Amino acid sequence: MSTATISPSQIGRGARPDGEGSVQVQMETGAKIGNAKVFAIYGKGGIGKSTTSSNLSVAFSKLGKRVLQIGCDPKHDSTFTLTKRMVPTVIDVLETVNFHPEELRVEDFVFEGTNGVMCVEAGGPPAGTGCGGYVVGQTVKLLKEHHLLEETDVVVFDVLGDVVCGGFAAPLQHADRALIVTANDFDSIFAANRIVQAIGAKAKNYNVRLGGIIANRSDATDQIDKFNERIGMRSLARIPALDVIRKSRLKKATLFEMEESPEVLAVQAEYLQLAQRLWDGVDPLYCEPLKDRDIFDLLGYD
């Protein structure tokens, strides 16, 4: 993976490889992840992407699939409910060998979590330095070099919340479907619209396509439904606003490890249904995102 700065004289009017024309990460070619089904989870910061990703990963594993979850946020907290700890990141372990990846062992950066889900935290450079996209690229490269992706059925990328260049876009190079986690409120739907726009732009260069919305912390979905109908989106699942979900995070556990109750069993069933639906395959969506003013006018009550 390399970076490139393109001077104005080099910029033509035709199509350019992704990353050209600005200071961005140019993605490697031929970086497809084996035969695994790959999902990238997006959404507004704090919306519950890591909770959603971890429970979805366990749901896939309950279906008998071999699952790998890759946390792509410098906070490196994507997998702690699976591993019960904050595991070392790829950047952490690369630093210990002076960035000589050939000296790393699999057990240095891949950790087994709940029900056999394999977990990796890409980590990231310190705030204001480096490129998150480079870190994700190095993580996938390491996994391929150690042949870990050859024995994986499902890969789940849990992506940082902000729409930025490298860190946001890197998982899209590898993903088959991008899923957006949102709640039934203005701020998270507004962010979802921006993410739809960004993914649509990246889909011109990658094979990734929108898969749909996962409604999280949502007892109702009236605003999400308005948004979906307007842009041609669909909802794949609805996770209600349950206190047991908050408690599961505090217990460093997934919902599949919580004491059984009617509401726990219901939300487990929702995740299992979602995993099965995604495994069976969802048709790609080609949505038309709204302008900021239009979404402002669309949402809310008269």
UniProtKB/Swiss-Prot annotation:
Polar residues bias (residue ranges): 1-10
Keyword Chaperone: no
Record's cofactor remark: Binds 1 [4Fe-4S] cluster per dimer.
Cofactor(s) of this protein: [4Fe-4S] cluster
Gene3D superfamilies on file: P-loop containing nucleotide triphosphate hydrolases
UniProt-listed GO biological process terms: light-independent bacteriochlorophyll biosynthetic process; photosynthesis, dark reaction
EC number assigned by the record: 1.3.7.7
Coiled-coil annotated residue ranges, if any: none
Binding residues annotated for [4Fe-4S] cluster, in chain numbering: C131, C165
Keywords: 4Fe-4S, ATP-binding, Bacteriochlorophyll biosynthesis, Chlorophyll biosynthesis, Iron, Iron-sulfur, Magnesium, Metal-binding, Nucleotide-binding, Oxidoreductase, Photosynthesis
Ranges for region Disordered: 1-21
The family this protein is said to belong to: Belongs to the NifH/BchL/ChlL family.
Pathway(s) of this molecule: Porphyrin-containing compound metabolism; bacteriochlorophyll biosynthesis (light-independent)
Binding residues for ATP: G46, I47, G48, K49, S50, T51, K75, N216, R217, P240, A241, L242
InterPro entries in the cross-refs: NifH/chlL_CS, NifH/frxC, P-loop_NTPase, Protochlorophyllide_ATP-bd
Entries under PROSITE patterns matching the protein: NIFH_FRXC_1, NIFH_FRXC_2, NIFH_FRXC_3
UniProt superkingdom: Bacteria
Entry-linked CDD domains: Bchl-like
Protein name, UniProt field: Light-independent protochlorophyllide reductase iron-sulfur ATP-binding protein
Oligomeric form and interacting partners: Homodimer. Protochlorophyllide reductase is composed of three subunits; BchL, BchN and BchB.
